[in-house]
Amino acid sequence: MKRQGLNRRQFIRNSTLLAGTALLSSWALPGVCGAAAQTGKRTAVDQVMLGKTGIKLSRLGFGAGSDNGHIQTAIGKDGFNKLIHYAYDQGITYFDTSQTYATFTWIGDAIKGLPREKLFIQSKISGKPGDVLATIDNHRKTFNTDYIDSMLVHCMTRGAWTDEWKRVMDAFNEAKEKKWIRAKGVSCHSLPALRAATASDWTEVHLVRVNPQGSYTDGEVADWSGSIHHDISPVIQEIKTTHAKGRGVIGMKIFGNGTFTDPADREKSIRFAMACKEIDAVVIGFKSGGEIDEAIERVNRALAEA
């Protein structure tokens, strides 16, 4: 696996050097994203602070939900376990899942043997479970852990979600008091939902769809097809506002829900995210060590040139 990664890195250096240079003038959207501060050498696997939550995680996270996790389950449970450990060996400590992902029941075994105190595990709850606390407790039991670092209300699309999901949100508050979860937040899939998340004092962590191409990002109406490329500026404005409130911001859909098959698109998106100081971390779905190696190299290069 190491050899595969080295070959991948050599390929990326040779094939994207000129492309990366050409993109320097095109990856940023003027006036929408704050420039990242220069603080010495930064890398994909730095431990970064998630807003003002007091929680640290690796800048690059491992997403276990590509195509609702079916991309990951296709490599088999043993392959998945090895891939999680490979990611950790490279310095990735942030692992992202959900009760709706096919990988959900695999996470506990996958992280077995890894130091729990060094991991950041984020999970999500969809819908409105009848017993929210029991659902959160099931996460703990499934992952063989006493606590979940970040628990999100998953896939909000309505601007009124903060009213409609109040019972669920109250249960999250109780779970945090019980120390079952360390932070609480939301993943949004429309601009109305994202604006509501920004306005709500309840939210501590925001999982936001972001890429400069506007692919699979938030618009006024929730869209699952990816056929509409949205103006990313309103999303960035919400990110800036929520960051200013001390919230944690994690970028998702960095590779356009896996549709960025052109390396230039992946490079452009990574550079955009790494140049944006309001984004604390990003999460990308992986199915191979080579993909992890590529993402780390792209992030490292983008940070060095930001």
Regions found by a protein language model. Give the residues of each.
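N-terminal secretory signal peptides and thylakoid transit peptides that target proteins
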Residues: M1-A22
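C-terminal segment of N-terminal export signals and the immediately downstream linker at the start
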Residues: W27-G63, T73
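Conserved, mostly hydrophobic/aromatic
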Residues: L50, F62, F95, I121, ...
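Acidic (Asp/Glu)-rich catalytic clusters
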Residues: K52-G54, G108-R116, H139-D146, T198-D201, ...
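Active-site mouth loops of central-metabolism enzymes
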Residues: G65-K77, Q122-G130, F260-D262
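Short, acidic/polar
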Residues: A74-A87, G130-T142, S190-R195, D265-F272
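Active-site groove signature of glycoside hydrolases
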Residues: F143-G159
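Beta/alpha (TIM)-barrel catalytic core signal, keyed to glycine-rich beta->alpha loops juxtaposed to Asp/Glu
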Residues: C155-A306
